[in-house]
Amino acid sequence: MLYNSSLVEARVRRFRSERVVPATYRTTSPLAVSAWEVPDEPVMFADAAASRFQPFQVGAPWGRPWGTVWFHATGAVPDGWGADSDTGVELVVDLGFTHAQPGFQAEGMVYTASGRILKAVEPLNRALPLSFHSGGGASDGARLVDLYIEAAANPNVAQEMDFFPTPLGDKTTAGEGPLYRLRRLELGLLDIPVWQLEQDFVALVGLLEQLPADSQRRAEIVHMLDRAVDAMDPEDIAGTAAVGRSILASALARPASASAHRVHAVGHAHIDSAWLWPVRETVRKVARTFSNVCDLIDRNPDFVFAASSAQQYAWLKEFYPDLFERVRDKVASGNFVPVGSMWVESDTNMPGGEALVRQFVAGKRFFLEELGVDTQEVWLPDSFGYSAGLPQIAAGAGARWFLTQKTSWNETNVMPHHTFRWEGIDGTQIFTHFPPVDTYNSDLGAADLARAERQYAEKGIGTMSLVPFGHGDGGGGPTREMLAAAERTRSLEGSPAVSLSSPHRFFKAAEAEYPHPPVWSGELYLEFHRGAYTSQARTKRGNRRSEHLLREAELWAATATVRAGVDYPAGALQDAWRTVLLQQFHDILPGTSIAWVHQEAERNYARVAESLEQIIDTSARALLGRGDRKVLLNAAPSAQDGIPALGGSDTRSTPTGANSLRERDAGFVLDNGKVRMSIDRAGLIRSIRDLGADREVVPHGAAANLLQLHRDTPTQWDAWDIDEHYRRTVTDLTDVEIIEIADDALHLTRRFGASRVTQTVRLADDAPTIDIRTEVEWHERQKLLKLAFPLDVHADRAASEIQFGHVYRPIHTNTSWDAARFETVAHRWVHVGESNYGVAVANDSTYGHDITRGHTQGRASTTTVRLSLLRAPLFPDPRADQGSHTMNVSLRVGATIPDAVREGYRVNLPLRTVRGVEGTEVGPLITVDGQAIVIEAVKLAEDGSGDVVVRLYEAHGTRARGRVTANFGVLAVTETDLLEREVSPTSMQNTDGPTTTLELRPFQLVTLRFTRAE
């Protein structure tokens, strides 16, 4: 017999789409619909239900961009519906859904008339099974339906991910016209056997598409599908579905092979805390998703769902307390699993060390206190690369495991492992898994399962991987169709063997199976999204400033509490921290969200700054009294201008050398006795002479403090990406409009395009340091502004500050891994050097850098450090970065790594001038005598006990020994984890009263808790 497999497959697909799918509902019944449009921002159910609803016709338009319409659906279930076990009564809703991804368009949430949330309706989850809810729209067993649907008219900002500029990301420019038409709001009588038949078709057709064309198993499946289609009557699918299913049952009953890859399927919904929607919409997305999950758990007791981000649970508790209690019950039963340990799924490249610590402190404390769960994993599937400081921080918070899949997005290199141990800068290792399915939004279809098995790098050693399944990014979560797929692939020949699982079960099993995996040392650099280090500079500046204000506020508040007995503002500090932690979400701090999000972030940072300045002012008054004497407070970990670290005084040291600025024919000469700098008439630095080392720092013929403008047109992902080809087009900004001496500094102004730059250049007193303040009125589009410092230093690597230390990165391009790091991230400083000489470049708000090698007349290698100051991407915010910006940069010559550390703190924590009583000083609450041991935080304990908590780290990459002294009465000193729980000492050698001797490994992070004497 002539048999054409491809024709059979086409026949099966058409039969499924044209006959089976339409037959899943035997019949439908209309409902009466009325509607009320919310005038402005969303309201809660009680306000909506009390409003005046107007009759609404199915087919009519609704929903201005970002608007909300409440629909009220009433009616009765027809007699005889749902009378047998093969049918179910459902509410079926189509809000005008498009082909866009769920979570990127209209969404709805269904309530009973009493205000109980039932579940969400979304493009691929449109039905509400009324029969599964006690009183789900009915009361006292009646057949009446009375339901409300809160419909969100969220615009599809992403479109087809074509990255075109759009006004939809700003509520003020998004327009007023309706976006959607209500296509369907009615009752449907679900034919359960037909629906099950549809799931059989999906499983088997998907499987055969993944099998080799010449495989026996594929041929068997094709024949069985062909027979099933023959056996069913296309005019009576309901009546013949059982026959078709009986034929397909034999294909589905063939068990998986003993060597089949084992998939731990974990329900999940990646919900971006903001991205192409504002934070306020995320709050509703969380409620919609979590209600879906609770509904699914009620009907599938084996289903396990994992959700990260304590912030999202906190929103649920605040705005949807009844739903939060339902989630709490599911957590107690083990079906709903909090994961991730963090307040949000944070970026990990740019947050400072203490901020990353607080992500874990805030997240883990919430999960422990509210849900009784001590989370043990770091769950960051979508962040844009992972700092080498993260393993130590995670382990210090009690985390054992780490999961991401984002490195699968690498443009150049493929990570060699999926299961391994990841080692951080201090040597801490954490068991790590990259799901080889390469997505956190799996549908558990055959294509995803086959990809997981095909790409799994540990074949022959390991046998298992984790697959997160459920609609995500904009939420939604798993569906009943996905659970049906899991059921059919539990043991199915030709497919990996799927089991519903949890992250904990997977990691325990993977560790047991693979106790000695390979080790990856250092950062997990993402070869993609490099522009995220620079986009939305105001958001990044707000983050950096907030982090350092928080340090100051906690330090001075703790000092005032201990010394002056004032109340510690724990509540205000917690609010400030939680606000900052939210802004560190991996689409906010990286600058990759819509305009609405970044405008809101700026307002949040301003509010945080106001609150923290008030705390600092109140603390200073308590410590210094009310007077007119200027007092300088130094929150930095090392002395500045004679002001002690973590202390204050009204007397600063007098500069020992003269600081001169003279105009010459060729330009200007600045000299402070440490450095002599020559600047030409164009405002470019032509010479920096280190007088102590008798060494020239600027290569012959080069110019430092050179602003360079690049065309910045990435191939895709505008705000996210800087592509390597940007380097091919560059304009050196050398035209100067104004250059003059004023206030012992050189001031210069340049104009280019529609923009203007004003710089102030000066030498620091008594230090070989140049300070440059750059103010930009930025009105470019798709341009990248960099600030270049060519240096006469021979280096093959550069040190960049990260959390609690620094990493060395090659600056040559010997390998594809080296070449791919053409843009890197640093915190407060970078350092390049030879064995006995170096230069540090520090900043107060910049993260993106590129550091390259050059040559002087082809003979000697030089090094160029460039800071990425500003970008101007067009998507998702077409006005990103437009307006005013200020950046401070310093260049210290003859710098060691310790010098770089001090310089980074100096630039970010300048001396603070306050007023107090003459002669008043603020003695440091804590002192440390080891130069390499840096105090990162001084605060009171989270538990309200009044204990003083001090966080320290070794900053130079060396072994360090030093004494930490509490300058107040102490009963005991203990070493704790990051959650301030006592642990066995790893660094404490001995304690003598208030003094503790520490021995630290390179980059070791330590938390000490001082119990105060009454």
Where are these regions (language model features)?
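Histidine-centered catalytic/metal-binding microenvironments
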Residues: 1-42, 173-277, 547-659, 938-939, ...
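Short beta-strands within extracellular/lumenal beta-sheet-rich domains
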Residues: 61-81
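Aromatic-lined ligand-binding clefts that engage carbohydrates, nucleic acids, or primary amines
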Residues: 83-111, 633-635
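Beta-strand-rich ligand-recognition modules
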Residues: 102-164
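The substrate-binding groove and active-site-proximal loops of carbohydrate-active enzymes
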Residues: 124, 230-239, 269-285, 308-317, ...
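Catalytic grooves of carbohydrate-active enzymes
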Residues: 203-233, 270, 274, 408, ...
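Catalytic alpha-helical scaffold of carbohydrate-active enzymes acting on polysaccharides/glycoconjugates
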Residues: 249-264, 288-300, 316-374, 388-396, ...
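C-terminal (or distal) subdomains of carbohydrate-active enzymes
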Residues: 390-396, 409, 418, 434, ...
